[in-house]
Amino acid sequence: RAILAQLGPDGRLLALDRDPEAIAAGMQLQAADHRFSIRQSGFSRLHEVLAEHGCLGRVHGILLDIGVSSPQLDDPARGFSFRADGPLDMRMDPGSGQSAADWINAAGEKEIATVLWRYGEERASRRIAQAICTARSTEPVVRTGQLAGIIAGVVRGEPGRHAATRSFQAIRIYIN
């Protein structure tokens, strides 16, 4: 809305998002302001979407908001956060790709450790991966609280930071 407020009458704002809930909210704005369009798409398809809108070569700016949103973190049913127990999903678009639970329960210990290190800079990545594999050998890891508990059993959080922060970040990035 703030960007739209700064656009002139001939300006256009095109938004891309993979989250169906964000698309639904954006459709309301699209209906209210002809200068705004929203598409359910990943940023990897930006060139294609710009071509579809006749905008190639006519773009004056691009703003990428590539993080997880507060509504995603605040809704336990989305499975993004360790703050409240929910299904272990973490997908921006719950209708596509592999859920975090599916990946956690299928990936090898080395792959899990690599993801935790590469995307979360988790120093205890190997110990966490080993604990996840041990835990899932008796019961599949399917809940955010379950995964957070496994991680907290291996590492202590830093002051002001939950033990699972880095690992959850890494898994969210990898899944999406």
Task: Name these PLM-found stretches.
Residues 1-176:
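S-adenosyl-L-methionine-dependent methyltransferase catalytic core, i.e., the SAM/SAH-binding region
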